[in-house]
Amino acid sequence: MLCALFEEQHSEFISRSGLYRYRVGDVLQVTGFYNRAPQFKFICRRNMILSVDSDKTNEEDLHNSVTRAKKILENRNYLLLEYTSCTDTSTVPGHYVLFWEIKSTCEGATPCVPLDAQLLESCCIAVEEALDYVYRRCRAHDRSIGPLEIRLVEAGAFDDLMDLLVSQGSSINQYKTPRCIESGPALRLLNSRVTGSFFSPRDPEWTV
């Protein structure tokens, strides 16, 4: 069954037979057609949730927020190759963490804007500004959530993540990068590949 989400230009594909190897609730984007058959790109899983306080951020909300921040990178000739997320409650208050793998798209004599703290901090606030009212209230008013953090990881980190999860039983044919991670070994792997850490420089906009 196909259910179009027109406002996001996404399609949700539901197949209990497993024919297309997607889980019930996966959100897909139609990227083209082969004859009359639609071709899909996996976007996210609908029901995965990040939560620190009363906030509840599902995977589609996170995807939409990251998409906004990606545009900042693309305008500076950088490409977000992969990402995932977790909540870090080792700090008080806890906060959202995004793991990003980025590469430069500069070619030839095209000058690249340095991938510096200011650029990554602007991505942090772009993500937060795109999250929902409850998250922004918790951040800006209640102070029950700390500033969002982006951790850059070295090239190949997400390939290593796939190898780890497949070794733990995930099917390599059906593997999709999880957008929210709770597994201790997976988080330890990603944290061991971190090359830089950047936090949102201010509170997101919030009004009563």
What annotation goes with each model-predicted range?
Residues 1-208:
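AMP-binding adenylation
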